Amino acid sequence: TTIPYGLDCSGFVLWCYIQLGADKTETIEKIGVGTWNQWDKSAEIKKSDVRTGDLAFINKYPGSDGNHVGICVGFLKNGEPLIAHCSATQNKVVVSTCGSEFKYFRRPCSVLTAN
């Protein structure tokens, strides 16, 4: 898929859900537009409870000026979540382990229906 103007991190999360067949309007409403909105529309979970499709954030809200979000796309053999996210510094989508970056894990509060 070619996106003429690119995506930010929260837009990439929405795009992932839509590519899996979720309704666009419902996804925007239930997942949220913008990193902080996606934080607000999700519930905190432990790293050990992360499932594919859960969200990973770098900063905690409130209390920080900025944030970054990615989506869990799988796991290493040791159970470490793999997070896909738009990297501004690399100017592309990358898949990273949580490492020291992604510290906060959340699950969207609403279940999406497929088209």
Task: Give the positions of each predicted feature.
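Catalytic cysteine-centered active-site loop
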Residues: T1-T52
